[in-house]
Amino acid sequence: MASTGTKKRVCYYYDGDVGNYYYGQGHPMKPHRIRMTHNLILNYGLYRKMEIYRPHKAVMEEMTKYHSDDYVKFLRTIRPDNMSEYTKQMQRFNVGEDCPVFDGLYEFCQLSSGGSVAGAVKLNKQQTDIAINWAGGLHHAKKSEASGFCYVNDIVLAILELLKYHQRVLYIDIDIHHGDGVEEAFYTTDRVMTVSFHKYGEYFPGTGDLRDIGAGKGKYYAVNFPLRDGIDDESYDKIFKPIMCKVMEMYQPSAICLQCGADSLSGDRLGCFNLTLKGHAKCVEFMKQYNLPLLLMGGGGYTIRNVARCWTYETSTALGVEIANELPYNDYFEYFGPDFKLHISPSNMTNQNTGEYLDKIKTRLYENMRMIPHAPGVQMQPIPEDAIPDDSDAEDEAENPDKRISIMAQDKRIQRDDEFSDSEDEGETRLPGEGGRRDHRSHKAKRSKIDDSPGKEADKEAKSSDASKEAKPAAEPQAVPMDTTPAPPPKKSEDKPEASKPTEVKAKPAEKEPGEGEASPADLVVPVPKVSAPSEGATLPAVTIPPSSGTSQPPADPPVSAPTPTPASAPAEKQD
């Protein structure tokens, strides 16, 4: 992989469960395409260059910041096995045909919305430059209505989050279908400008006319570029860059949301444009150059092998790295036959977008944008709390220390041994014969090899011998049996003894037994003061021997006349 352009901090949101959801037999929307994209990203090694997060599941409180309470409650309640009980609500909320009820519908909406909102929070905190959620970009969902395979409008929720920190947010839509749900949500405000390049005329959703420019305070803040069939890379580049340059000049946003619907690619199952991956990704590259917080989202795309190719290539574009045209082997390699290449070729369909037609639309849009006051501002106001707390898990555990979690949720928090865990020092040899990939098992193997090495064994033996020496206590003096018979009175001396200096009595150390440690203390010097002769019948005062450090205290005040200790005993005082 070669580096291209300026490096950006990129974070990427993906949940492994998102590919399990299934709209139904024959339905063109297949969430499995997101899993295929993720697998290509892994096998190209792009995951090493960005931060990967599992998105939280957006809760009802987050979804109802835009959608109505009744609609979100309905999505949370409806299931394939209870559809018959909600016939009226299904008609009211437009659920049933294009937007079917399937197993896990609400959880799918939670994951899609959670990734986009989490990316917006990350951008608000300036912890990343580009946030990616390919599971998002569902731009048709309305406030109280599903539409165009979309149930919850994650884009609107993400923009509402960005508006907490940014005065003006720019939304760009390069899906082949008009981004009607996002335009409708912000049609009357000047804080969000919506720009959509789409197929127009007898094509879903039928909105996005050149004359749809917004209303009220939002007048001229909706920009629609209607296109005809067959537009190619060259024509698309000639309209996208000039229009976006003018928008950036006049509006001066501080954050950008880019919906990267891949149904505008050549050969799409429901599309009729003729773009290649390079033409599609040029839009990402161009907006990246403005160095503003950028949120990339998915959207349409119904030839799933090309969707995976497109979003993988645009991930590499966001990262600023070049990836090979040869596809690496992956879990879905057979999907990409017969050429097994990354890039696709345009078809030979006719481009009905003539130069004259495109110039006419550009001129009209320039005139509308001249009506925009430069960089409209907003009054200062308190910043609301973020949708996602910094440490939500820790707070939940503190509030509910006894709350149990499901086995599935617990397993998701455990890193599997075979998960990718390469680090930046991959390839450096830490032990002979070992590479750089490290996981739980290789870590254990490495520790066991280190512990079994010869140097380690020698260190262990040295430490154990030192420990045994320290642990072995010094020989304690044994209790000396004392003679309790009172000493006979001394003979009377006619001459009075003169007071003199005290004499030193050296205690003779006991002889060592073979193999025994040295007796402690070795030479104990005890000063014995000389006293004058006592009167007849008096007894000699006892002499107290101070205990040595680390030995037990001997009996207090033993008589002076003690028998000679045994050889194993502690040294005793020798009497003159």
UniProtKB/Swiss-Prot annotation:
InterPro entries: HDAC_PDAC, His_deacetylse, His_deacetylse_1, His_deacetylse_dom, His_deacetylse_dom_sf, Ureohydrolase_dom_sf
SUPFAM superfamilies (alphabetical): Arginase/deacetylase
Broad EC category: hydrolase
Listed name of the protein: Histone deacetylase 1
PANTHER family: HISTONE DEACETYLASE HDAC1, HISTONE DEACETYLASE HDAC1-RELATED
EC number(s) from the headed UniProt entry: 3.5.1.98
Similarity comment: family membership: Belongs to the histone deacetylase family. HD type 1 subfamily.
GO BP annotation list: chromatin organization; heterochromatin formation
Function: Responsible for the deacetylation of lysine residues on the N-terminal part of the core histones (H2A, H2B, H3 and H4). Histone deacetylation gives a tag for epigenetic repression and plays an important role in transcriptional regulation, cell cycle progression and developmental events. Histone deacetylases act via the formation of large multiprotein complexes.
Entry keywords, A to Z: Chromatin regulator, Hydrolase, Nucleus, Repressor, Transcription, Transcription regulation
Protein's cellular compartments: Nucleus
Compositional bias segments (type: Basic residues): 438-447
Reactions catalysed: N(6)-acetyl-L-lysyl-[histone] + H2O = L-lysyl-[histone] + acetate
Biased composition (Pro residues): 555-568
Single GO MF annotation: histone deacetylase activity, hydrolytic mechanism
Cellular-component GO terms for this entry: cytoplasm; histone deacetylase complex; nucleus; NuRD complex
Active site: 140
Record's compositionally biased regions (Basic and acidic residues): 400-418, 428-437, 448-473, 491-515
Origin superkingdom: Eukaryota
Acidic residues bias (residue ranges): 387-399
Pfam families, sorted: Hist_deacetyl
Region described as Histone deacetylase: 9-320
Region of interest called Disordered, as start-end residue ranges on this chain: 374-576
